[in-house]
Amino acid sequence: MKFVIKSISKNSGRLGQLRIGKESNELQTPLLMQTTKGGSIPYLSGDVFDSVCKGQQQQQLLQLTLSTMDQMAESLVQWNRSLSEYVGLPGHATVLLLRDPCETTPAGGNDRDVVPLFTRRGKESLTATRYLELVSSFAPDVYQGLCDADTNPDSTKKRVQKSVDRTERFMEQCYERRVENSTLLAPIVGGYNTFARTQSIKHARQQPAGSYGGYILEGFHSNGLAATELKATQLLPIVEHCVQQLEEEQPRLMPGAYTPLLMLELIRQGIDIFDTSYAYCAAVNYKALSFSYKLDEIRPDDEHTPLLDMTAEEYKEQFKPLLSGCTCLACEKHTRAYHHHLYKTHELLGPILLMIHNLHHLMGFFDVIRASIGTDQLPALLEHLRMQNTSTEINYRIEPNNKIVTKAAMGKGFIAPAV
């Protein structure tokens, strides 16, 4: 993996080019990894995903997770082609992570020599040896080092220190037995403790040159919707502390469903790679992304919401697209009323269309981010996203959908509210 910085600005972050593998195209950073579940883009077939990516970078970076794919390791040993071909998305680069950023990772299960892997079949205890065997079976282009990232804003100092000490022990084996033809990402852990983060960084930086090809910053949240609830005042000082001690020539990755506003703040601090788990978390909770990311865009006063809750009764008679001017399939062919109807009738097409729209919207957002960095306008975009032309700061947190639709409550025409 080769990373080249094209431009860097104190106020707007940095632009870069990432080349993964000898025959890959150059990926422009800041970059969105495509979150997958079991190797598939959630709700989307390969053809639909290709149509969503039309007009974007030809090659995408697929984020694969061991917690949703570990059962494939045995068959992958017999596979003599690329991992992206195995999952039916040929031509794309792959990065293998340990945990699914879309789902809350249960706490506990960590021990001196093992890390818990929570799968659909239950918990498996991974030693460093077993982990490296699995990575060798998958043979991804990029993989993260084994780490104890079971920390969040509420973690105690003792739990944080244990996570750093255990990660150092795991990484000694990962550095010693690097997987051939794959790039290792060095994990930086330590919760919200600056001393622990510094210890983790020092351990990575004291390794011989070429031991790893980038950094993955973890241990800030428990994945799932918890990432959308993080406070910028708590997270940003820790990330800034870490970035100041990392080499500029190495890419920096932060997985998780961070809000668009927080992603902008992190990009401004020098983080290069994120994922699309925010789009998935919104879709699975029947939310459509609707925030404005164009500086010259002017909307009516009632159109400043960052998320449309398609479970709300107000949309049952709104015969207009999710977002005016959006060119995705969900907006060009369907109305808000239809999306609300799909929710009420439990149709699988509902989250499919929302995922199409949310991915399209988030990818367009990153196109604008890269253009804004190039013209040093990221601060203006950040302010636009924070206020959305209103007088109050916008909240991008995703609320879980706890409504239950029953036949008894709907009546004729499905007009009764959900209970």
Swiss-Prot record:
GO MF terms, alphabetically ordered: metal ion binding; tRNA-guanosine(34) queuine transglycosylase activity
Keyword Endoplasmic reticulum appears in the UniProt entry: no
Binding of Zn(2+), residues: C326, C328, C331, H357
GO BP: tRNA-guanine transglycosylation
Domain of life: Eukaryota
Any Pfam family: TGT
Co-factor binding details: Binds 1 zinc ion per subunit.
Chief localisation class: cytoplasm
UniProt entry keywords in alphabetical sequence: Cytoplasm, Metal-binding, tRNA processing, Zinc
Cellular compartments annotated: Cytoplasm
Cellular component, GO annotation: cytoplasm
Cofactor(s) in the UniProt record: Zn(2+)
Assembly description: Heterodimer of a catalytic subunit and an accessory subunit.
Function according to Swiss-Prot or TrEMBL: Non-catalytic subunit of the queuine tRNA-ribosyltransferase (TGT) that catalyzes the base-exchange of a guanine (G) residue with queuine (Q) at position 34 (anticodon wobble position) in tRNAs with GU(N) anticodons (tRNA-Asp, -Asn, -His and -Tyr), resulting in the hypermodified nucleoside queuosine (7-(((4,5-cis-dihydroxy-2-cyclopenten-1-yl)amino)methyl)-7-deazaguanosine).
Family designation: Belongs to the queuine tRNA-ribosyltransferase family. QTRT2 subfamily.
Protein name in UniProt: Queuine tRNA-ribosyltransferase accessory subunit 2
Organism this protein belongs to: Drosophila grimshawi (Hawaiian fruit fly)
